[in-house]
């Protein structure tokens, strides 16, 4: 029995030893008889360890090709010696070619214009030859001649010079004759022409296909099933796009709870209903309602129709009513006509008018009945991150405008500018930093409280009551550190810093807190808690703001 056990132990020892030997890496070494050639080989960055012989021999071929690209066209592998797990490749590099003398024909002259030609011949440093041939192929592809062939023929090597004839067999120029949508046949056709910038004469090339693939990810009301595909026939080119209509309507509800000075609970709430692409035209409609007890109330309607009359013009109209206690009521009309520059940016002209009614019949709080109007410009650029949360990687919007305000019979000129910018910086797969800045400035010879911009709350400076801060000039920074807990959720910190100009003077504000955002099948829920302080008032934990933001998709 003891003898049998000993045999088993010996057998297992041998088995593991053999497996260990079989699992050992194969080591590749490069050598040459010539010292100067050995120095060249030592500078090559190559894969030294391999599991399979086939991988090792493939690496030797790659090294030989690399040597040809840097001028050693006649390099040879004399032999590969094996000693255990070490494989030694013996190279002979031979003479190095420094220059290529390329003869051109009539078809190839325009593609090598960066080099001066003489007698239909150009001299190209050997180290630039491969890149030059690659550029020629890329330029032909941009012209729609994707099936062209670029070749060096009649290659001869004499001393340190390579002689060859450049032959370019240009293929027929191809255009995208037809775009076919699969999976969402009712996809708005206006997007094909104006969003993707495609027409019957659009040149087919790889760059355009990549642009379309990237732009597709930025459309909020579709899911991309798979990348674009192309079908080539003898005379036509068909582009296939694979989309699926997704649930993009959203109902957004926010409930906020805080404590008033008398100790009672203050309830803040709003409804934000957005209908996107309801008619398969890419249109947007929004209904926003907000009420904070009896203190203030707002109703806003917005409508946007993209690419009207199959053009690059997209009008947007909004109407809102805001009531502050029983002090004043503001009615605002905004209109924008945007011109699409490309899928990421647009330029627009705007007109907005506002009228305000003083409900107190006195001017104790610097409130007057007035009306104003502004004409302005707008530039907007956004680059989607294409993540699960529909975040933007980079966003910027600038809106300068000029106008007039009328109080009784007195008119005064005004100027205002509003700018918003944000950036999402990925540190690694799980960690990211989000930065957002919004700046507003109103210039006037006098200011009324009921014409000032209103900020504060979950969508601006967290830790303060919704729209509780009236300001003629402000700039605030939202800073978040985000930690991805899963593909569909993340924790984040809140650090909001602001400098504001109010009727009471200039103040610095700070809001800090924590939040957690997660998604379910048809909803996105954002929970946060924030605490604010100002220059004149410190932190008060009894004034902590709890925010619950629930977005339902349907």
Each PLM stretch: what is its role?
Residues 258-261, 376-486, 493-497:
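C-terminal outer-membrane beta-barrel translocator/porin domains of Gram-negative envelope proteins
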Residues 478-480, 509-517:
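Short glycine-rich, acidic/polar surface loops and turns
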Residues 205-208, 212-227, 231-397, 425, ...:
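Gram-negative/organellar outer-membrane beta-barrel architecture
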Residues 485, 490-513:
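C-terminal hydrophobic structural anchor segments
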Residues 24-34, 44-259, 270-272, 286-293, ...:
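Periplasmic polypeptide-binding modules associated with outer-membrane biogenesis and secretion
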Residues 355-357, 404, 441-443, 499-501, ...:
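Feature marks short, surface-exposed loop/turn motifs that line or immediately flank catalytic pockets
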Residues 1-29, 554:
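Bacterial Sec-dependent N-terminal signal peptides
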Residues 72, 322-328, 403-413, 536-539:
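Outer-membrane beta-barrel proteins
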């Amino acid at each position: 029995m003891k003898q049998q056990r000993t045999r088993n132990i010996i057998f297992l020892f041998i088995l593991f030893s053999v497996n260990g030997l079989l699992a050992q890496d194969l080591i590749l070494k490069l050598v040459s008889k010539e010292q100067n050639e050995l120095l060249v080989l030592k500078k090559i960055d190559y894969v030294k360890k391999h599991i399979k012989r086939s991988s090792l021999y493939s690496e030797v071929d790659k090294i030989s090709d690399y040597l040809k690209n840097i001028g050693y066209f006649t390099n040879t592998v004399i032999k590969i010696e094996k000693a255990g797990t070490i494989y030694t490749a013996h190279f002979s590099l031979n003479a190095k070619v420094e220059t290529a003398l390329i003869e051109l024909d009539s078809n190839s002259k325009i593609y090598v214009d960066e080099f001066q030609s003489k007698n239909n011949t150009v001299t190209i440093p050997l180290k630039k030859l491969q890149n030059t041939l690659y550029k020629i192929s890329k330029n032909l592809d941009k012209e729609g001649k994707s099936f062209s062939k670029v070749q060096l023929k009649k290659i001869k090597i004499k001393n340190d010079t390579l002689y060859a004839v450049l032959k370019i067999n240009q293929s027929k120029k191809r255009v995208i004759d037809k775009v076919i949508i699969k999976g969402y046949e009712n996809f708005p056709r206006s997007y094909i022409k104006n969003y993707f910038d495609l027409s019957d004469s659009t040149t087919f090339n790889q760059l355009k296909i990549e642009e379309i693939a990237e732009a597709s990810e930025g459309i909020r009301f579709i899911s991309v099933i798979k990348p674009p595909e192309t079908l080539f026939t003898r005379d036509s080119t068909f582009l296939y796009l694979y989309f699926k209509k997704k649930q993009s309507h959203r109902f957004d509800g926010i409930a906020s709870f805080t404590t008033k000075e008398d100790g009672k609970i203050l309830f803040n709430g709003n409804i934000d209903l957005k209908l996107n692409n309801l008619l398969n035209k890419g249109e947007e409609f929004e209904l926003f309602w907000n009420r904070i007890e009896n203190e203030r109330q707002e109703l806003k309607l917005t409508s946007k129709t993209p690419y009207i009359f199959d053009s690059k013009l997209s009008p947007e109209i909004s109407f809102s009513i805001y009531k502050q206690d029983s002090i004043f009521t503001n009615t605002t009309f905004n209109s924008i006509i945007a011109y699409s520059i490309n899928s990421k940016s647009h330029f627009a002209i705007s007109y907005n008018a506002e009228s305000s009614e003083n409900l107190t019949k006195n001017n104790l709080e610097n409130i007057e009945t007035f009306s104003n109007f502004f004409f302005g410009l707008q530039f907007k650029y956004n680059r989607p991150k294409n993540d699960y949360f529909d975040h933007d990687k980079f966003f910027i919007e600038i809106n300068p405008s000029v106008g007039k305000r009328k109080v009784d019979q007195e008119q005064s000129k005004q100027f205002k500018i509003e700018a918003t910018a944000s950036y999402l910086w990925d540190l690694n797969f799980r960690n990211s930093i989000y930065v957002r800045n919004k700046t507003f400035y109103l210039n006037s010879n006098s200011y009324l409280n009921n014409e000032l911009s209103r900020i504060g709350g979950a969508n601006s400076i967290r830790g303060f009551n919704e729209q509780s801060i009236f300001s003629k000039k402000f700039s605030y920074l939202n800073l978040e550190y985000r930690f991805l807990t899963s593909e569909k959720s993340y924790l984040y910190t809140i650090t909001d810093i602001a400098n504001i100009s109010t009727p009471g003077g200039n103040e610095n504000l700070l809001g800090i807190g924590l939040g957690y955002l997660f998604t379910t099948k048809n909803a996105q829920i954002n929970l946060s808690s924030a605490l604010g302080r100002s220059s004149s008032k410190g932190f008060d934990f009894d004034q902590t703001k709890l925010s619950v933001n629930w977005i339902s998709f349907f």
